[in-house]
Amino acid sequence: DVIPHRENVLLEDIEIFKDFLVVSERENGLNQIHIKRWDGSDSYYLPFDSETYTAYTTTNIDFDTTVLRYGYQSLTTPSSVIDFDMVTKTKTIKKEQEVLGGKFKKENYTSERLWATATDGTQIPISLIRRIDTEKSPETPLLLYSYGSYGNTIDPYFSTVRMSLLD
């Protein structure tokens, strides 16, 4: 099988290159980008810097290239366009969303992925962001928004509005 069936994985998109097959997947509510050499010599998932993120392939029109262009953002990282060399496994950030005001510093925030158990035993992913100087306690204020049913989820994305609320 080129792409074997996995019960807990949703295939969202594919990109076909001369030497590579790139499969966009969703597992446990999170995007993944799986890169496979056609000759079977290498198969790996793109590594990402955060537990909570959104990643997706963008337009890749050159069949002969070894460079994959994709989009990435997380709760703490502005939207970025990245070129990834599938041979050397190196990435180059081509563009990152500018955050106006000059006060945003990524290192002031942290994010994590938690799991809640529903009454039927289903595991529900939770993406959490906070300032690093905010204490985690039951008394800490929390803004919760959610949606996840019928195969649809809210991807963890960067929001300047949310950052101002955290500040």
State where each predicted segment sits.
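C-terminal, active-site-flanking charged/polar segments
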Residues: 1-3, 39-42, 162-167
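Serine-hydrolase catalytic core recognition
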Residues: 47-48, 52-167
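Structural motif
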Residues: 1, 29-36, 76-84
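Beta-sheet repeat architectures centered on beta-propellers
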Residues: 6-9, 19
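Beta-strand C-termini and the immediately following turn/loop, strongest in propeller blades
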Residues: 22-29, 36-37, 69-75
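Short loop/turn segments that connect beta-strands within beta-propeller blades
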Residues: 37-41, 86-87
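Surface loop/turn motifs at the tips and blade-to-blade linkers of beta-strand repeat domains
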Residues: 2-7, 47-51
